[in-house]
């Protein structure tokens, strides 16, 4: 099965169970979310290249089609890692004390690179952000740690 270890196949099956319809697979618009739920960080360009779509109900991806995609993304070198994100955010750390302005982080997420929309940023901040201090600064390393931590599975 696309050189994916049994335990990882079980994780993929669980994601398909949660995100898809039995026997039909997942909607191709959810390809990126499925990969991220499996602790991968594919770019939007890679998701599109691998068959992700922008509109719902255009295409379904079955488990046997997804496993080679999962395997390929696991091997992909263009995924951000913790150190990459920290190096990027250090550019905003003018005092070199591990903090940056919340407004600058929000601007970066909304306007730079593969930008997010307002709702995505609000969700991200609610899930991963420490409160800003009186001057509007936040500790960015904890933010990145939470952002990249394994997803919590609720029973």
Swiss-Prot record:
Single GO MF descriptor: calcium ion binding
Domain EF-hand: 7-41, 80-115
Cross-referenced Gene3D superfamilies: EF-hand (1.10.238.10)
A cellular component term, taken from the record's GO annotations: muscle myosin complex
GO biological process: mesoderm development
Entry keyword set: Motor protein, Muscle protein, Myosin, Repeat
Subunit structure: Myosin is a hexamer of 2 heavy chains and 4 light chains.
PANTHER family in UniProt: MYOSIN LIGHT CHAIN 1, 3, MYOSIN LIGHT CHAIN ALKALI
Name of the protein described by the UniProt record: Myosin light chain alkali
Annotated gene: Mlc1
């Amino acid at each position: 099965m696309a050189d994916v270890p049994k335990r990882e196949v079980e994780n993929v099956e669980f994601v398909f169970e949660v995100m898809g319809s039995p026997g039909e697979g997942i909607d191709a618009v959810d390809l990126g979310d499925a990969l991220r739920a499996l602790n991968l960080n594919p770019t939007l360009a890679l998701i599109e290249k691998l068959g992700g779509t922008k509109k719902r109900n255009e295409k379904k991806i079955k488990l046997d089609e997804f496993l080679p995609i999962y395997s390929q993304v696991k091997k992909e070198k263009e995924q951000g890692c913790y150190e990459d994100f920290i190096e990027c955010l250090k550019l905003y750390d003018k005092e070199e004390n591990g903090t940056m302005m919340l407004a600058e982080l929000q601007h970066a997420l909304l306007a730079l690179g593969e930008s997010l929309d307002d709702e995505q940023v609000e969700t991200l901040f609610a899930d991963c952000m420490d409160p800003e201090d009186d001057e509007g600064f936040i500790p960015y390393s904890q933010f990145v740690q939470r952002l990249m931590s394994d997803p919590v599975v609720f029973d």
